[in-house]
Amino acid sequence: MAAGLPPVQYSIDTDADLETRLAGKGLKVVEIFSEWCGPCKSVLPTFRRIRLDKDDENALLFLTVCAEKCNFLETAKEHRGKSEPLFLLYRNGQLKARIEGANTPALNQQVLSLTPANADVDDLEENPMYLAKMERERIARGETVKDAKGAKKGKK
């Protein structure tokens, strides 16, 4: 493998990191695994091949999340203690597919059909996770809805 290539998968260790990744553009393949099992190794060659075929590295990200350490996704909490991985495919912050187990053909088909050619085709204003994150940040800064709307108008 050539030097300088991005990793195939990113390990997500915090709920904040997961939220930030899902609030972005492009397809995010989130593997939920049990702590005692670890991430699924059988799907890595498929993920590597698909990832290397993409020109825009932001159009597709593979993420691994330990079910026992994740509180951000209700689905992750429900998956605790299970032996098979669960794959959740998010496009522009919206759940598009759910694949249980290491079903490589189904993963391959779904990833290829859902991955945009370029992440810029997604609109963050249509990403519910992005909008929720921005709202929480606005509230944390003590801004009102009126302040946020005024700031938006000033940018145009």
Curated annotation (Swiss-Prot):
Residues 2-116 form the Thioredoxin domain. Keywords: Cell projection, Cilium, Cytoplasm, Cytoskeleton, Disulfide bond, Dynein, Electron transport, Flagellum, Microtubule, Motor protein, Redox-active center, Transport. InterPro entries: Thioredoxin-like_sf (IPR036249), Thioredoxin_CS (IPR017937), Thioredoxin_domain (IPR013766), TXND_domain-containing (IPR051766). GO terms for cellular component: cytoplasm; dynein complex; microtubule; motile cilium. SUPFAM superfamilies: Thioredoxin-like. It is found in: Cell projection, Cilium, Flagellum; Cytoplasm, Cytoskeleton, Flagellum axoneme. It comes from the Eukaryota. Disulfide bonds join 37-40. Its main location: other. May be involved in regulating the redox state of functionally important thiol groups within dynein. PANTHER family: NME/NM23 FAMILY MEMBER 8 (PTHR46135), NME_NM23 FAMILY MEMBER 8 (PTHR46135:SF3). Consists of at least 3 heavy chains (alpha, beta and gamma), 2 intermediate chains and 8 light chains. This is Dynein 16 kDa light chain, flagellar outer arm. The lineage of its organism: Eukaryota, Viridiplantae, Chlorophyta, core chlorophytes, Chlorophyceae.
